[in-house]
Each structure stands twice: as C-alpha cells, then as structure tokens.
Amino acid sequence: MIPGEVMPADGTIELNAGAQAVTLEVSNTGDRPIQVGSHYHFGEANGALDFDRDAARGMRLDIAAGTAVRFEPGQTREVRLVPYGGARRVFGFNQTVMGDL
C-alpha cells in the first residue's frame, strides 16, 4: 500500500441511495456565473437563481461531496436535490433557517 492510496471496492458506488429526491428547474437571472457546492442548503442559494425555494428547503444537490454545479448567466437547467440527513438542523448560509428544518 502507498500512503494516501485509495483502494475502492469493486462495483458501482451509488450516491445518496434511497434518498427521496426532487428535480427542480433553476435559472440564473443574474449577469455573473453562480456556483453552488454539494452540501450548500439549496433553498438559501444566491438570490439571482430563480427556482421553487419552498421545495428546496432542507435540500442539497445530489452530487458527489466536494463538487459543485455552475449556472452561467441566463442559463436554465434541472437539478436533482436530496434532503439533508442527520439531525436536519441548518445554521449559517444566508441565515434564513438557523435551526431545525
């Protein structure tokens, strides 16, 4: 074994298996690109993004940890969101929740 070496198991890894996902259409109405990270509370994402924020409350992107989705100015795309797990408490971000979901 080499220090830092990753030795994954055989087969396919399924992210967020069994999570109740929703798909939303999101439009960047701004004049700058917007990037949203994998674990950002999507309901509190940049105000220039136009989407159903109520449906996105308590949700994050269904993408690999440490990655992000970029929305170019004027771009509309669908994103898949999954619920936060654990205690389902959110703090920080744009401070619109600051506690239990």
From Swiss-Prot:
GO cellular component: urease complex
SUPFAM superfamilies: Urease, beta-subunit (SSF51278)
Catalytic reaction(s) noted: urea + 2 H2O + H(+) = hydrogencarbonate + 2 NH4(+)
Cystines in this chain: none
Residue ranges of coiled coil: none
Keywords: Cytoplasm, Hydrolase
InterPro entries reported in the protein's UniProt record: Urease_beta-like, Urease_betasu_sf, Urease_subunit
A single BP term in Gene Ontology: urea catabolic process
Subcellular location: Cytoplasm
Pathway assignment: Nitrogen metabolism; urea degradation; CO(2) and NH(3) from urea (urease route): step 1/1
Gene3D superfamilies listed in its UniProt record: Urease, beta subunit
GO molecular function: urease activity
Pfam families xrefs: Urease_beta (PF00699)
EC assignment: 3.5.1.5
Similarity comment: family membership: Belongs to the urease beta subunit family.
Assembly and oligomerization: Heterotrimer of UreA (gamma), UreB (beta) and UreC (alpha) subunits. Three heterotrimers associate to form the active enzyme.
Protein name (Swiss-Prot/TrEMBL): Urease subunit beta
Biological source species: Jannaschia sp. (strain CCS1)
